[in-house]
C-alpha cells in the first residue's frame, strides 16, 4: 500500500464520499530522523501518496479526525519524538495541532489558546453530537498540559482540566474518544480508562483493572448504544455492554502486546 519508510502509523481516515481518497498520519521511524513522517494523502486507493503535512525530520503525525459531516475539514496532531539508547525525547516545538479545509491537501497550524511552549503527544476527538467541538489532550509543561476544548472547529481553544494520561508517560497513551450522542462525554485511554461527562471540567476513573487488563490504547463507542464499548489493551480486546462496569475478554485474537 505504500509508505514503507513510515514504520509507525498513527491513524488512517477513508473519505466517506470516495474510498480511493485516504489520509494517513505517519509517525515515522522512532530510532532515526527522516523517513516518511507527517500527513499523507492518496487519491488512487494507495497506489501513490503525496506528503501534505511536513514539519521536520523528527516530527510526524499521530492523529487525524474528519469534522463530523464535513470531510473537507480535517484536524491533525503532530508529534515530535525520538528514541536514543540513553533515553526517549518526547516533545518539542514541532508538536502541535493543524487544520485543513480542503480534505487534507493543505494545512495550517492553529495556536490560539493552546500551550505556547514545547508540546509532546496530542490526542484528538470530535463528535457528531456537536460538530463545532474538538477535544485535545496535550502533553506540555506542568502549567500548560491538560485537556482542551474548542467550540469553533479548532480555531481557538480553552483549557478545561490539567489531567493527561500517565503511567509510563503520556507518550504511551493520549488517545481520546468522544461520545457520538453526548458532546460532553469523552473517554480517555490511560492505565485505567478515565471519563468526563461535563466537557472536561472533571474526570473520573471508569474501571480499575479488576475485570480487565489495564494499559488501554483504543476505545470504540457504539453510536446506537453508547453503553456498548470496545477497548483495545496490551492484553487484547475487551467488550462492555454497561458503560465499563463489566468487561469480557476475547482471548482468541492475536493482538496482545508481549514484553521481554
Regions found by a protein language model. Give the residues of each.
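Beta-propeller blade termini and top-face loops
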Residues: 1-260
